Amino acid sequence: MIRAPPMGRKSRMGLRDDATIAIRPCRREECAAVLALWECAGAIPSATDTLEELQRLVRTHGDGFLVAIQRNTVVGSVIAGWDGWRGNIYRLAVAPEARRRRLAQRLVREAALVMRAKGSRRLSALVESHEAHAVGFWDHLAADGWRRDERMMRYIRASD
């Protein structure tokens, strides 16, 4: 489990409070909260966005289904998929009130660690090309080794 450093308590300055955010594998009882997070984060629903499918994911590949928890509330999530050949990042989402705190970047880094531990040498992120804020986020991760693959509109990096 990774904890963020304290965020500061200067509310008049616009800074967040001192609550820490923990990143860890999702628990079965948190799947409904993840679905709600995806909805409030503006994710486009897919056929697998059901409580049953997420609970199955927790059961079968739970170490790659990560959540960010603040004050017992799911404020972020990411799915790190491993197919035995390449690691893939899906469904990166952060609650609007938890944005601009590098939480999405922390979730991506933790997902990369999970996949590296499984043997992944290359990572890929599926990004919806019409989501300008998402594309901007991944472009910003060039400092972490991510680069855009123009042929497929995906981002890849070595999992070193």
Model-derived features: where do they sit?
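Conserved N-terminal entry element of GNAT/NAT acetyltransferase domains
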Residues: M1-E29, S159-D160
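Conserved acetyl-CoA-binding loop-helix of GNAT-fold acetyltransferases
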Residues: R100-L113, D139-H140
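Conserved GNAT acetyl-CoA-binding A-motif
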Residues: M115-E128
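Acetyl-CoA-dependent GNAT
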Residues: P25-R91, V108-E110, V114, K118, ...
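Short acidic, glycine/proline-enriched helix-loop-strand junctions
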Residues: H133-R151
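A short, internal acetyl-CoA/4′-phosphopantetheine-binding micro-motif in the GNAT/acyltransferase core
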Residues: L92-R99, V127-E128
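Conserved beta-strand-loop-alpha-helix junction that forms the acyl-donor binding cleft
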Residues: A125-V135, I156
